[in-house]
């Protein structure tokens, strides 16, 4: 604990922080919950399943050095953009993606964070479920929000945003101020 606290202060106690984990031998592993979901979206959005999956995955790892078991709710890298209206699509395993919604810079004022979004509610439910099953077993972190430039790229489309960096610099700077 002292070493990690020193790390965040850019200090060194006795050695650098070393974090890595290994899979436990198969005979020491617990079964990973089997998904009975009918769609990838249903599986991604199931808070209890995601919490049980996190517990099994972390139980099946050995945390070495200064590593700590950490799980976080996850709906993919563009969930923040979905809170601003981008349709969110879920892949079978590993990632999700959105469709851009900002076709014209004049429409940026119509984008607002949806505090009642089902995705935000799902992240809250996952956080609560992970806190319940992880109590005394692992740390629960926050989702990776991908705000700022990542969110703007999803809202506008990455290739379009790249071209916008030539013709719409002021709009980009303004948008980054509130994303």
Task: Walk through the language-model features, giving the residues of each.
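Active-site-proximal, glycine-rich beta->alpha crossover segments in alpha/beta enzymes
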Residues: 78-179
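N-terminal basic, low-complexity leaders that serve as flexible interaction/assembly modules and, when applicable
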Residues: 1-91, 170
